């Protein structure tokens, strides 16, 4: 099982959008690869951000009809991390309605906007295994999933460290703006620290330029600078596009919002689907 942490200590860099669309791309790819009588591999999305935007998208979107999970107030990722739910994780996981065109092979663990703010303190108060709670949850679901994609909170917290400790791979979305690029150093230092102290198997896959607007000369210069410094670690840039925002609001990934004409194809003529498909393929190849 490959566990991909979408990580950056800076907020507003596109972590949630990256998480949803990479997960959808992986699910669609495995659906297309599976034979007619074969079960495709499965993807699990985990939302560790207190804003719970990934979970909102997977549950119907900001403006859509929110789907009810039928679970109690602690039967979610917060309750699992704080050990406040009596249910096993396999009873809490729900199947996402997206991506359309896949064979219902993307799941998510429900989150809780009310409970998530309490999780970091609970983890911090457990000096023995507070950094390893998520790893334990992931070990439980390992037989069922090929990919797990984790949306992380901004800042450096026990939640984000849990994510890195439990992951096999990590990618850093980064806007082509000075504050975001300056924050890369901190993010890379955190990853290296976790690799040394807690998780030597964690592999850094690269930097994902996100929400790019190449009409601005400054952004072209920043991208050239990143290529000069990090070379092959720079992934295909994702442009800022209205369709991506509209898709999030409707509770859809970009591949469902702008689907391909043929059900066995991932990309449509829409540029956003093409960019995310290229990034997903790059990341999948780097994960092996």
Predicted region positions:
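P-loop NTP-binding core
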Residues: 1-288
